[in-house]
């Protein structure tokens, strides 16, 4: 197995594996950072030192989890592995560009880590707002390195998005219409369009910040006629679609898992699911200012962003109830991926409800920058995106490797993780309602109890992460090979066996279209 196989690979399966391994490694880095945060907050008083180092850790935690864990695993890992198999394509449309998309990520990660190692680090929060991110409050190279890191990650994602859009539109067998493709393919298509439209705006914003810092421009400096609010608009025009980019592939994976373990041949309301994802993608672009309710917008502007944000709950509700309808009347197979999917549906819905609370501009004025917001987005990320990733991983692991995971241990792992994340993030709702602000390393004694409980929860999650590594080791050590696969119309990716050959669909698949 020459090293060139991995460095120069143009094979979608190899590149998908690289993404999965990279994402798992980054996930462990991000978990370590989050444990530092929870250790600092486990009791009043200082542990790490000042708030600069604390905020550097918070900022790095966010960037690592978003750009180097969730996106590489969901889009790069599962997207690369599954989409060519699901649509019957021999590979991605641009296999060498696919390789470059991956190899831009390790240098990007390196730059992010370097930003923590020089000067005082980038303690700006992942939003990198000026004037805090300007060259007075953050002198030195830290923020500049962070900006370059984001540039590389952004280029990687844009190239990947172009690749997925081209592949999905161009590389299906002619007989298959777009409306016969699996929901995961649709999810990644919508995600790729969102990436393609939002990332250039982020690039513009952070490039202007870079020139403000180094070339004496004043895009975000009132002294020269600029406005820091402009940066917020540019950032959140990317930042809000970004959170849908993080969850949409998860929606696709959950649809597959729920349909498969319900014994159904298709998810309930396939077209409704497709339209819902497209509606979420569209609406995701016109609600960005709900992150900025505290900057002093007109009341009519606030009214618009409040109502537009609430409208997103409708297509989301369509998806949640369609998953429940898919489960209804099925012969349920109670295997671990379904447990993750059920956990996803329940906890994502809880996170969505707190999102509806925060959509109210008047309430958000009070709750903005408190732990209520932290609890909200960790419910949809730490229990939405991550649960979808875990469910998809235990579901498709036999496809990727040809080996099966130990079903009892994966169920125990699910139980530990479920307890851990809920114990970590549920109390944060109470902290937020009691007014505890985000991004501070210390707090008044009144907040001690819930913070201590939250930190204990984070340690339980750590146990789950370590157990997951053990489960992985056990599967590769025991080498239980997959005996047989139930083929239905919805799991075509398993057609070639486990694992599939290195090259699949080398000649176009024969597709028989049913006369309906």
From Swiss-Prot:
Organism: Salmo salar (Atlantic salmon)
UniProt-listed InterPro entries: Cyt_c_oxase-like_su1_dom (IPR023616), Cyt_c_oxase-like_su1_sf (IPR036927), Cyt_C_Oxase_1 (IPR000883), Cyt_c_Oxase_su1_BS (IPR023615), Cyt_c_oxase_su1_dom (IPR033944)
Complex formation: Component of the cytochrome c oxidase (complex IV, CIV), a multisubunit enzyme composed of 14 subunits. The complex is composed of a catalytic core of 3 subunits MT-CO1, MT-CO2 and MT-CO3, encoded in the mitochondrial DNA, and 11 supernumerary subunits COX4I, COX5A, COX5B, COX6A, COX6B, COX6C, COX7A, COX7B, COX7C, COX8 and NDUFA4, which are encoded in the nuclear genome.
Highest taxon listed in the record's lineage: Eukaryota
Protein name: Cytochrome c oxidase subunit 1
Gene it is expressed from: mt-co1
Its biological purpose: Component of the cytochrome c oxidase, the last enzyme in the mitochondrial electron transport chain which drives oxidative phosphorylation. The respiratory chain contains 3 multisubunit complexes succinate dehydrogenase (complex II, CII), ubiquinol-cytochrome c oxidoreductase (cytochrome b-c1 complex, complex III, CIII) and cytochrome c oxidase (complex IV, CIV), that cooperate to transfer electrons derived from NADH and succinate to molecular oxygen, creating an electrochemical gradient over the inner membrane that drives transmembrane transport and the ATP synthase.
Manner of cofactor binding, per the entry note: Binds 2 heme A groups non-covalently per subunit. Binds a copper B center.
Heme found in the keyword field: yes
